[in-house]
Amino acid sequence: MLNMSKMFVGLFTVILCLAGTLSVYTQEPTVSTPMTLAPVPLETVSESDQYSQLSMEMAQLRSLIEKKADKPGASKGWSAPKIGGRFFMDYVNHMDQDWDGLPLGSNVTSQNWCGFREARIAVTGTGYDFLDYKLELGFEKNASSCPSYKDIFLGIQHVPILEYVRVGNQYVEDGGSEICNGTTNYTFMELPASLGQQFMSRRLGVTSRHLLADDRVRIFLGAYNATNISDSHYVKDDNQGIVLNTRTTIAPVFCQDGRRLLLVGAYYNFTDSTGSRPLAFNRPGGWDVYNPTGLGNFYSDRYQKAGFEAVMQAGRFCVQTDMFLQNYADVNDGAGSGIGNQTNYGGFIMAKLFLTRNDYRKYNLKNGNWDSVDVSRPFKLADVQGVNWPSGCGAWELAGMYGVYDSFVFSTSVPAAADAKMMNQQVGAALNWYWNPNVKWAVNYFHDMTKARYDGDYYDPRGDYLGMSCRVSF
């Protein structure tokens, strides 16, 4: 009984404790009277020393910007001129020639040479946010003692409808991307033979360029004087002729300055009163060497050229092609003796591969041509503990090319009624080493194959050429 009473006492104690706890949690909270705090004065931002110092620095910076904008060379005037150019040293060796059987031909071994090839110096600049200019002079191996005019033009932006207009001596875009490069960015030392034989180079004229679809569509129009103005002694005559030229390119794929590129284009050239023109050259591109099958000059009342171009570049690898047709109306010797209308065709295909990773050639959509090589690891000398060691390997490029050009042959030394044709085929290989975007070492090898027919006789001359070059641009 005693144990039972103790158990009841303990149970009663637990119940009392639980009841007390529940009463605490169920009790209504006590509401306290809020305290009123006295206002504390705070320093405003405009009165702080830090803000005053920042305002003074901003005012000084604004004053410097305004003073710089007022100086010549800002958007209110002309920029400071920039000087650029290039310098080429070439070596050319003619190996295994077989030209002796050709009319007016001869062995060309004596034309091997090594030395200065070409130099250019140019001044460029901009002004008033809508003008640009370029003045360029050329010094070349076979030119006269006087420098020749190259690019000399004034460009005007934001022209209604035409968008961008150039006036002056400039390239006639009667070819694809390779033609419009200028010699600085050629893959080979010269143009493929099919292009280097018949194109207009520079002429005095007016051109316009219109860009659409984020610059992926480019439309080019030009009107020029048909006569080449090459030196300061040129005197205009009364029969200058006119050149009308257009070129359109479309790049549905373009990223990273052309690292991924798919481009197609077409061009057309019409020339009235062509004047005296050299015949097709059987030589590697435009090298300044003897021409074994260039049989004089001819005249033509009208000249037309139409072509197609395409480029596909995927990183280090690129394939490029250009094909064209030419038509000469009333080919003659300038004295009435001629062979009527003549049509030529030609083209080339080129494959290029950079052997070094992450290197590729950039493409300029606005200008419609190739730009400099993007060299990820430039070759240079680095100071390591007082000793200069090579650093970086530069960019190495391997290229192959096949070109063909089928043309008529005309010369005052061959009867006008003669059935004369010539087909020139050329295969080439190139190994290029770019120390950086401005320095290039090149080795080129060409094999030239020509099938010629003069007055019923057939000729099959061939030749091999080795070329090396050091090219520096700045």
Task: Name these PLM-found stretches.
Residues 1-61:
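Cleavable N-terminal export/targeting peptides
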Residues 2-12, 241-247, 256-274, 297-333, ...:
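Domain-scale selection of a single, long terminal region
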Residues 31, 45, 95, 107-108, ...:
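Outer-membrane beta-barrel pore domains
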Residues 57-79:
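Long amphipathic alpha-helical scaffold segments
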Residues 61-62, 132-134, 196-197, 212, ...:
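Extended alpha-helical regions
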Residues 70-73, 193-195, 294-297:
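Short, P/G- and charge-enriched loop/turn segments at secondary-structure junctions
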Residues 74-96, 100-103, 108-231, 235-274, ...:
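Outer membrane beta-barrel
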